Curated annotation (Swiss-Prot):
Entry GO CC: ribonucleoprotein complex; ribosome
Residue runs in coiled coils: none
Organism: Jannaschia sp. (strain CCS1)
Function: One of the primary rRNA binding proteins, this protein initially binds near the 5'-end of the 23S rRNA. It is important during the early stages of 50S assembly. It makes multiple contacts with different domains of the 23S rRNA in the assembled 50S subunit and ribosome. Forms part of the polypeptide exit tunnel.
The name this protein goes by in its record: Large ribosomal subunit protein uL4
NCBIfam families recorded: rplD_bact
Length: 206
């Protein structure tokens, strides 16, 4: 599929042929859902923890005598039925991550790229190289382009001046090719890829 290429100032800079196997698939929500869940589960800290009966700070002494009170029989104050007592089978620290094959992860990335192309929200830019790291100048260009929530994917290395200028612009994320992932692509409204990024993605996802 042929897509127009633009410069950072918005002017046209020719066109590029995109691989149909990467950008021309029929997006499948089930594949995207599985990959996003895998990403988010792996990112979850899993540090949740409550105190069990043996961990709460209470004496193990019987709270009152067994018989003659007219009340129910009880032992220690740390029992789960009491306020402030230990929690029975509560959450403990654990990993929420699960396995997903490399082949399936690559497939998910192809479908994410295809989804943006199908929505008409894929932009190919010639280069994002800047002479100096000026946030104000880049913010003005981004506003003129209409990129309110955009992910920009560069080649193997992101231009240092551009990365510094973009760091303080709200709604703008910049990643190298190896950092491209399904969750970040779907999270942003517009996907912007440099020509170097397109070549690197095609090499990565062969």
């Amino acid at each position: 599929m042929k897509v127009d290429v633009i410069k950072l100032d918005g002017k046209k800079a020719g066109s590029v042929d995109l691989d149909e196997a990467l950008f021309g698939l029929e997006p499948r929500a089930d594949i995207l859902h599985r990959v996003v869940r895998w990403q988010r589960n792996n990112a979850q800290a899993g540090t949740h923890k409550v105190k069990t009966r043996r961990e709460v700070s209470y004496s193990t002494k019987k709270i009152y005598r067994q018989k003659g009170t007219g009340g129910a029989r009880h032992g220690a104050r740390s029992a789960p039925i009491f306020r402030g007592g230990g929690v029975y089978k509560g959450p403990t620290p654990r990993s929420h991550g699960h396995e997903l094959t490399k082949k399936f992860r690559k497939l998910g990335l192809r479908h994410a790229l295809s989804a943006k192309a199908a929505e008409g929200r894929l932009v190919v830019i010639e280069s994002i190289a800047m002479d100096e790291a000026k946030t104000s100048a880049l913010a003005k260009q981004v506003k003129e382009m209409g990129w309110k929530r955009a992910l920009i994917i560069d080649g193997s290395d992101v231009d240092a001046n551009f990365a510094q200028a973009a760091r303080n612009i709200e709604g703008l994320d910049v990643l190298p090719t190896m950092g491209a992932n399904v969750y970040d692509i779907l999270k942003r409204d517009t996907l912007v890829i440099t020509k170097a990024g397109v070549e690197a993605l095609e090499a990565r996802l062969k």
